[in-house]
């Protein structure tokens, strides 16, 4: 499995999702949410995954939503687009909460906004 917004590996049943934008303290983008929604749905049916570790690359876990990629565009979206975005983000969190596997947030440094929400999921 390959994702553009994070590094994923599964070694001996320990699946690691490492947010991978250290220059921006692993800020979340639309692609990050889409990737998280996809990987969490896939892991639910992957018997080789026993434990999930969610962490960040560099000195920060996750600084929240990337302003130029999410916040600005969200302010310009129409209702149907906002609904799709909200469903995607809710599905990612819901998938994590419903996953029948232990999830460990290995928090390294800052965790703010939506990053704190991920940490608590």
Residue ranges and their predicted role:
Residues 1-57:
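Conserved CoA-thioester-binding segment of acyl-CoA-metabolizing enzymes
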Residues 31, 35, 88, 95:
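Charged catalytic carboxylate motif
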Residues 31-32, 66-70, 120-121:
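Short, glycine/charged-enriched secondary-structure capping and boundary segments
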Residues 56-92, 111:
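Glycine- (often His-adjacent) and acidic-residue-rich active-site loop
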């Amino acid at each position: 499995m390959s994702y553009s917004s994070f590094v994923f590996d599964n070694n001996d049943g320990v699946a690691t999702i490492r947010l991978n934008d250290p220059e921006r303290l692993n800020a979340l983008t639309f692609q990050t949410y889409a990737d998280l929604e996809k990987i969490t749905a896939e892991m639910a049916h992957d018997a080789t995954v026993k434990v999930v570790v969610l962490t960040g690359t560099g000195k920060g876990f996750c600084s929240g939503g990337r302003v130029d990629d999410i916040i600005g565009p969200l302010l310009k979206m129409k209702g149907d687009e906002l609904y799709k975005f909200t469903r995607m983000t809710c599905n990612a969190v819901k998938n994590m909460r419903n996953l029948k596997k232990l999830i460990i947030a290995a928090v390294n440094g800052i965790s703010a906004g939506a990053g704190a929400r991920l940490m608590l999921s």
